Amino acid sequence: VPQTLTKSPGLAHARFSWRLRKGLTDRAITLLIEHSRSKKKLGQPEKWAKQRQIMVRELMGRKKYRQAYSLASTHHLDKGAQFATLEWLSGFIALRRLKQPDLAIRHFTKLKNTVETPISLGRAGYWLGRAHSASGDKASAKIAYTFAAQHQSSFYGLLAAEKVGIRFDKTLAGREQFPNWVNASFTKKSVFSASLLLLTAEQPDLAERFLTHLSESLDPNALGQLGTLLAELRDPHLQVMVGKRAAQHGNIIAAPYYALHPLINTPHPVAAELMLAIARRESEFNPTLVSGAGARGLMQILPGTAKETAKEIKIKYNVKRLLTDWKYNATIGGAYLAKLSRRFGGNPVLIAAAYNAGPSRAKAWIKKQGDPRKKSVDVIDWIEMIPYAETRNYIMRVTESLPIYRARLGRQVLPVSFSKELTGAGLLPLSQ
């Protein structure tokens, strides 16, 4: 290597990546810490950010919290998803592991001032409230929690509302009335006309692209009108996709965002809100979806799991029907959920963890981190310490959907507080 390039950030990153590939994790961490002393030494901080998160989690798993904080907080980013994640990690470690709430407040404040989506705003406000509370500043904690509680479509927004006694947001029941969509201004746009032509031509995937693009330019009232149209078309998948795109731009229109699916018209062995929450998260109600891992259909059932479950409930197994018959898929998915519910005592956190990552991993996390159903274990910390980002996110998205779907179904929204639901046994099979 030429002398002029020995201090190149690009060369350092290549060395870092090589060490990781060779399993030299400690040496990779040492190199990352050394180059995190300045933005100049990193060159392009964003290139290091994803592996930085992984290394921080690695150190947290080893209980090397000071080193983990140092690595998380010296990211030298100023915006974006990686910035938000690393600022949150810095604040979490400072608050929950180093017991330094004032330090945590700095990170959670930066997070709150940077993020935009309801999920992230709820998260930032809740943790800022926790940090202020730990520092003894009850007034500031209440302000932060109240801010987060504006976003009750999110996991942390629900928890924050509970902290300050704010009632469930009734708009999430999805009963808002909007003017007739026929007279909506967006019906005159070419992108809308194209989407209808594509739906008529049985090209729903292409129609989805046009409709989600259209939704980005609509105000909440027009989004509600578009949601009403999609409900009339009886396409819950398109409803969810438009609802999610709107949410990414800060607009929560509950009816499409938490669309109902006709699966609720058929009896299942578990609560309807659990079926809806899982199906929405798994496939976004797309009955023909096949994942990279081979999971199929509405409930994203793996063929092996489906075959075993079909045998247990004494129905004929047909792998093709997992994609061609959503009712068949839901029957098997519901039976599998009931099995997980019995295994994990009706606890929504463990059911979701097991459905996403497998029951053996859920049991392993109980063994390593404690049982989240017990008072001695902080269930929020338990979720946040799961090593897989996908599973952490999955648990939050499923559990936050439960009270909202109960509201959509006209049922009692919170039979117990949301925090108690997370540790409780409220989702036992209906036969029990």
Predicted regions and their residues:
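Catalytic glycan-binding domains that act on GlcNAc-containing polysaccharides
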Residues: 27, 39-48, 55, 62-88, ...
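TPR repeat positional signature
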Residues: 12-15, 52, 87, 125, ...
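Residue at a conserved register position within TPR or TPR-like alpha-solenoid repeats
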Residues: 19, 59, 94-95, 132, ...
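Solenoidal tandem-repeat scaffolds enriched in leucines and small polar residues
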Residues: 1-48, 54
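Alpha-helical segment of the N-proximal tetratricopeptide repeat
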Residues: 14-22, 54-62, 189-206, 210-213
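Outer-membrane beta-barrel initiation region
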Residues: 154-169, 177-204, 208-209
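TPR-adjacent "capping" and linker segments in tetratricopeptide-repeat scaffold/adaptor proteins
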Residues: 2-7, 40-50, 79-80, 176-189
